[in-house]
Amino acid sequence: MRFSSWALVSLVAGVYMSSECFHTEIIGGREVQPHSRPFMASIQYRSKHICGGVLIHPQWVLTAAHCYSWFPRGHSPTVVLGAHSLSKNEPMKQTFEIKKFIPFSRLQSGSASHDIMLIKLRTAAELNKNVQLLHLGSKNYLRDGTKCQVTGWGTTKPDLLTASDTLREVTVTIISRKRCNSQSYYNHKPVITKDMICAGDARGQKDSCKGDSGGPLICKGIFHALVSQGYKCGIAKKPGIYTLLTKKYQTWIKSKLAPSRAH
C-alpha cells in the first residue's frame, strides 16, 4: 500500500491509513491462482489485513517500516502465512504472534527513505507447498521500461477502504529515477533516491495501493523491491514508489538473520 500527503486518513480496523501515500491494494490486476505465491504474508490487526510482507526465512518476514505506525501501542498484530482468501478458514493458513520488529532505521516524518523492516515471528513457520521462502535477488539494477509484478491484498479501486479478500497481482513498468523526480512527476517531493525505484502504468490503470505496502516487486523472477508509497493510486504521473533491495539493505538483512541461521 502507499500513502500520500504523508497523512494517515483511511480508517481500517481502528488504524488510520492514507489513501494517498502508503499503498494498500492492487489496481488493474487479477486474482492469482490460489496459493501460487506461497511467500506472501498478511500482517493483521484484530484479524484485519493491514500490510503485506514476504517470508524470507522460516522465522522472518520482510515488510515496509511504515506499517509499524498503524498498530496501536500495546496491541500486537499477527502474521498469517499460507493464505489466499483473507476471510475463509483455509486449512493451510499458519498464524503467528510477533516476537519483535526491527526497522532499518527510525522513519522521519515526511521522509520516504529506509522504508524497510524485519519482523521476527515468535515461532518458525512450517515450510510446505503453501508456505515457502522468497530469496533476495543478487542484482538490484532495474532498467527503465522493465516489466515487473507486484502482489498483495490491497484495495482494487482508489476510493475503497477495504482490502481485497483474495490475493491479487498486477504488472507494472519501471520508471527511471530521473523521470520520477522530474517536475511533471514527483518533483523531488519525495526525492527518489538510489535506494528507491518507481513503477506504474503510462495510463494510470495499473498500480499498487492501500494495503499492498510491504509486498514484493518481482521482475523477471527476481525479488527486487518492497511496496512503499505513492500519491493516491492509479495516477499515471504519480507511480508507486518502492524500496529497492540494494546491497546496503541486503547486508543489513543478512546480519540480522545470521544468529537465526546459526541455530
Swiss-Prot record:
Q: Where is this protein chiefly located?
A: cytoplasm
Alphabetical list of InterPro entries matching this protein: Peptidase_S1_PA, Peptidase_S1_PA_chymotrypsin, Peptidase_S1A, Trypsin_dom, TRYPSIN_HIS, TRYPSIN_SER
Name the SMART domains on file: Tryp_SPc
Start and end of every Peptidase S1 domain?
Answer: 26-258
Q: What are the alphabetically sorted keywords of the record?
A: Disulfide bond, Hydrolase, Protease, Serine protease, Signal, Zymogen
Tell me the Gene Ontology biological-process terms attached to this UniProt entry.
proteolysis
EC nos: 3.4.21.-
Presence of the UniProt keyword Disulfide bond in the record: yes
Concerning Pfam families, the annotation shows: Trypsin
- Which domain of life, per UniProt? Eukaryota
Please report the propeptide residues according to the UniProt annotation.
22-25
Q: Which residues form the signal peptide?
A: 1-21
UniProt keyword Signal, yes or no: yes
Which residues are named in the active-site annotation? 66 (charge relay system), 115 (charge relay system), 213 (charge relay system)
State the compartments where it is located: Cytoplasmic granule
MF annotations from Gene Ontology: serine-type endopeptidase activity
Per the record, the similarity remark reads: Belongs to the peptidase S1 family. Granzyme subfamily.
Q: What is this protein called?
A: Granzyme K
Organism of derivation? Mus musculus
Gene name per UniProt: Gzmk
